[in-house]
């Protein structure tokens, strides 16, 4: 079944950057980092491509300004997820599965919390889906707020600087990389799919072991 046009657009990083610029990038990052129904949005490769487009001059903003805006969006998105989990988390766990919500995503994230503790708030920045649900689950378990914000800020900074910064480096030094955007997206999609499937299988294995 073909995806609706608006959903296809929201999952196309290149189109997001070319059409909406930094404003739309920030909105996507905000949503993907804390709104449970936005877990499918592009994250890692959107940040990398934002850096590439900034480095090649297609995205006409300075690198520091872009990093600051995306970092702020990531932190605020996770904060929103934390507050949602704290006040409405119980309703979310009782919510039936749908296209934009799967209970298995919460369980996968819960297993990461059991294994890594609060450090998952840093690790999860580089794990699609878990990145969306980690702050929500933090709120659900009433994680100490200053503790949450510390890991939120550190994780957000590492995620944005490493991905967008490396994208800028390649875009500035190798402008021709812009002709291989689709291959970059395919690479990130492959890594993302592998990571998500592996995380889900590990979570199921650990749940059965209990």
Protein language model annotation of sequence segments:
Residues 1-27, 52-136, 140-143, 147, ...:
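Membrane-interfacial helix-loop-helix
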């Amino acid at each position: 079944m073909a995806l609706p046009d608006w959903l296809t657009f929201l999952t196309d990083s290149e189109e997001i950057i070319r059409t909406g610029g930094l404003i739309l990038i920030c909105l996507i990052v905000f949503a993907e980092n804390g709104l449970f129904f936005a877990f499918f949005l592009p994250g890692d490769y959107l940040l990398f491509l934002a850096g590439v487009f900034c480095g090649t001059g297609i995205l006409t903003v300075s690198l520091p300004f872009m990093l600051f805006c995306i970092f702020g969006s990531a932190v605020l998105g996770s904060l929103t997820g934390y507050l949602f989990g704290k006040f409405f988390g119980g309703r979310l766990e009782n919510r039936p599965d749908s296209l934009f919500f799967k209970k298995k995503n919460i369980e996968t994230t819960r297993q990461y919390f059991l294994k890594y503790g609060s450090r998952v708030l840093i690790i999860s920045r580089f794990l699609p889906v878990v990145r969306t649900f980690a702050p929500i689950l933090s709120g659900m378990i009433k994680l100490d707020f200053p503790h949450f914000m510390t890991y939120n800020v550190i994780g957000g900074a590492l995620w944005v600087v490493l991905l967008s910064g490396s994208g800028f480096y390649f875009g500035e030094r190798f402008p021709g990389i812009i002709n291989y955007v689709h291959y970059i997206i395919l690479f990130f999609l492959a890594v993302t799919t592998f990571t998500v499937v592996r995380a889900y299988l590990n979570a199921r294995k650990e749940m059965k072991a209990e």
